[in-house]
Amino acid sequence: MHISVLLEEAVDALNIQKGGIYVDGTYGRGGHSRLILSRLDKSGQLIAFDKDPAAISEARSILDERFQAVHSSYAGMYTALQSLGINRVDGILLDLGVSSIQLDEASRGFSFRHDGPLDMRMDSSRGKTAAEWLTMASETELKEIIRTYGEERYAGQIASAIVMEQARQPISTTLRLAEIVAAVVRKRGHRDDRQHPATRTFQAIRIHLNQELEELSMTLPQCVELLNTGGRLVVISFHSLEDRIVKRFMRMQTGTDTLPRRLPIREEESRLHNQQKLRIIGKKIRPGSDEVSANPRARSAVMRVAEKLETRNAISR
């Protein structure tokens, strides 16, 4: 069962206006979407995106004229909303990463605990599977991807072992890949009872295969463009690579890093100088101990919130 992380906190952070237009960029299994809908009146709208066909199939079971489900990555959000006649929205939620259902269904090929075909595609209707990609990946490419996207200290040794085993017999199942990786990590004497030895390698291959970081980087500017003044952008990330992108983007959009401190200029002049488009709302939020106890996968979640500012073309004096 998929449990939405930071459910109340995320929807509260959107600061829902009853008649507003909202976007759930990652429908998953609809926890956030259903709560958003419960806070809208009859004139409100919610558009949900997901590139997983199974998620969209579930979303289309919601029979509510205020709700539309779009089979697309959130990276296609701007174009899709334009085609629906929507130019501006009042809030956008991005709940990044993989859903519990995707992880737990062996047939989806994300799990290093349950045996299944080595797939790992978020959108199972297109693109190469992880097994197909491994047949073409060089050791150098594998090492770079595992090191960059998995932040795995044994990337070189893992890549070498994968290529060696691949030459012996193509790796086509999740447990075989997990066993190859785990053998390398354990041989190095590294042990972390909180994390499976293959976690970082599986994360790296999944991120690369689904272009997760590229899509996130493409999507964040679209969100700023789409938001009405006062609209909120809420992003929940699950690993440091995602969170760094979100944090850096939000800080850049505040413009606070580009002027020397203590300059004697008015706030509105500073904002115009830096083309400030967002203001950060509060500090990052993590799940509480009760939520982590109930849903251990929530432990790495980080939520950041920003609000769209009014843009000005000139400074009034």
Swiss-Prot record:
Signal peptide: none
GO cellular component, one term: cytoplasm
Enzyme Commission number: 2.1.1.199
GO biological process: rRNA base methylation
Catalytic activity: cytidine(1402) in 16S rRNA + S-adenosyl-L-methionine = N(4)-methylcytidine(1402) in 16S rRNA + S-adenosyl-L-homocysteine + H(+)
UniProt-listed Pfam families: Methyltransf_5
A GO MF term: rRNA (cytosine-N4-)-methyltransferase activity
Key words, A-Z: Cytoplasm, Methyltransferase, rRNA processing, S-adenosyl-L-methionine, Transferase
Subcellular location: Cytoplasm
Residues at which S-adenosyl-L-methionine binds: 30-32, 50, 78, 95, 102
Superkingdom per UniProt: Bacteria
Function: Specifically methylates the N4 position of cytidine in position 1402 (C1402) of 16S rRNA.
Family: Belongs to the methyltransferase superfamily. RsmH family.
PANTHER family: 12S RRNA N4-METHYLCYTIDINE METHYLTRANSFERASE, S-ADENOSYL-METHYLTRANSFERASE MRAW
HAMAP family for this protein: 16SrRNA_methyltr_H
Name of the protein described by the UniProt record: Ribosomal RNA small subunit methyltransferase H
Gene: rsmH
